Structures are given as structure tokens and as C-alpha cells.
């Protein structure tokens, strides 16, 4: 079976849905989010605020998730290009 030659938002959504997520707040105003990908590889990101009094956990997690999605695009884009370069993609 051949792979397609491009990624779409739906592909990244499907990958993200399969990730296990852990969220930490190691210090006031700091958020760390890690995703364990379907293949077992782990990626992580962190965000922080200037004043811990104005810290909003959901904003911190949201920023990290956006950055992690960007990482998915890069990682899976690279993997697809590798397959495409070998002639395995459509």
C-alpha cells in the first residue's frame, strides 16, 4: 500500500488523538506538556508567564499544544518525505 504525498490537518488531528498527554506545573507560572506518540516517541514543550499571579493553566497548556502540533507537522512531514524519497508514497 502506498502512502499519500502530503499531510493534512486531519492527519495531524488523528495523530494527536492517539497521543498520551502529561501536564506538569513544576514551578509557579510554568507549564510543561509531554506527548507520547503512537510509535512510542515522546515530544515536549514548555510555556511560562512573566507574573505567576496572572498564570492561567489553560492558556499555558494551549500554547504548549500548539507548539507540539507544530512538532508533529515537522516529524511526520520528515517521515513522509523519507518514504516518498524511497518511492513508497503515491
Q: Language-model features: where?
A:
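Domain-level marker for long, solvent-exposed, non-transmembrane regions
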Residues: 1-90
